[in-house]
Amino acid sequence: MTDNTRLRIAMQKSGRLSDDSRELLARCGIKINLHTQRLIAMAENMPIDILRVRDDDIPGLVMDGVVDLGIIGENVLEEELLNRRAQGEDPRYFTLRRLDFGGCRLSLATPVDEAWDGPLSLNGKRIATSYPHLLKRYLDQKGISFKSCLLNGSVEVAPRAGLADAICDLVSTGATLEANGLREVEVIYRSKACLIQRDGEMEESKQQLIDKLLTRIQGVIQARESKYIMMHAPTERLDEVIALLPGAERPTILPLAGDQQRVAMHMVSSETLFWETMEKLKALGASSILVLPIEKMME
């Protein structure tokens, strides 16, 4: 059994979000030795326990107060929320923040040789899915009646197996759909990973640890979205150079020895279109442009 004074975090044991969740916690400075067969791991340097479970169990563990935090895909969270509401429950939790990984979309797909004239093409059809509540909400809003075929895996084979006329499943690249003779025709839900917290009173020590963890997560995500830039820039065009680089703060300007026409500029920027930006900087007279990744960041 885990100590109740320790912060309990549920994450996916294996699958789409597992590696990214582990990396996020590691970058936040949480030292955890995760063994393949061990479902509970204790952090070495913080009062934190990691529960490694199936992803569709995580929302319930948080909503039922079994764990304090959960890292989960929004698609799984929303499906469980709709499921509990359909059963007359009032599930409670807090979404602390959206994370920067686990992006996917829940889409409708039909056989490539069938005509598609919009969602009405599915009226009266049988649709295979692992997300019956999300599918029902979407098609109910469109006024479309359908028959649901619930599958917990290999949804994409349902049309060829004669189990369904279409599917509603997660899509990342679309390669799996194509391999099974299907095409994506409608996106019904877009999802990323998120961090959720249980409802109810939290011990002060746990809440302080959660606040610290949130600050570190913000720093990790901000660092991944930013770059550290160094360059030599002409003094008469500094404003134009700065305008090209949206930054967290104003840049640091340093004189260059023996050069009155240029200065050294250091800054953190959230700019992502960097080849095009570097070409524009060079056209303004900038030189020795270095773009470096940032491991950690705190404003």
UniProtKB/Swiss-Prot annotation:
GO terms for molecular function: ATP binding; ATP phosphoribosyltransferase activity; magnesium ion binding. GO terms for biological process: L-histidine biosynthetic process. Pathway: Amino-acid biosynthesis; L-histidine biosynthesis; L-histidine from 5-phospho-alpha-D-ribose 1-diphosphate: step 1/9. Transmembrane segments: none annotated. The keyword Zinc does not apply. It comes from the Bacteria. InterPro entries: ATP-PRT_HisG_long, ATP_PRibTrfase_cat, ATP_PRibTrfase_CS, ATP_PRibTrfase_HisG, HisG_C, N-reg_PII-like_a/b, N-reg_PII/ATP_PRibTrfase_C. Its EC number is 2.4.2.17. One of its GO terms (cellular component) is cytosol. It is found in: Cytoplasm. Its main location: cytoplasm. HAMAP family: HisG_Long. PANTHER family: ATP PHOSPHORIBOSYLTRANSFERASE, ATP PHOSPHORIBOSYLTRANSFERASE ATP-PRTASE. Equilibrium between an active dimeric form, an inactive hexameric form and higher aggregates. Interconversion between the various forms is largely reversible and is influenced by the natural substrates and inhibitors of the enzyme. Catalyzes the condensation of ATP and 5-phosphoribose 1-diphosphate to form N'-(5'-phosphoribosyl)-ATP (PR-ATP). Has a crucial role in the pathway because the rate of histidine biosynthesis seems to be controlled primarily by regulation of HisG enzymatic activity. Belongs to the ATP phosphoribosyltransferase family. Long subfamily. This is ATP phosphoribosyltransferase. The gene is hisG.
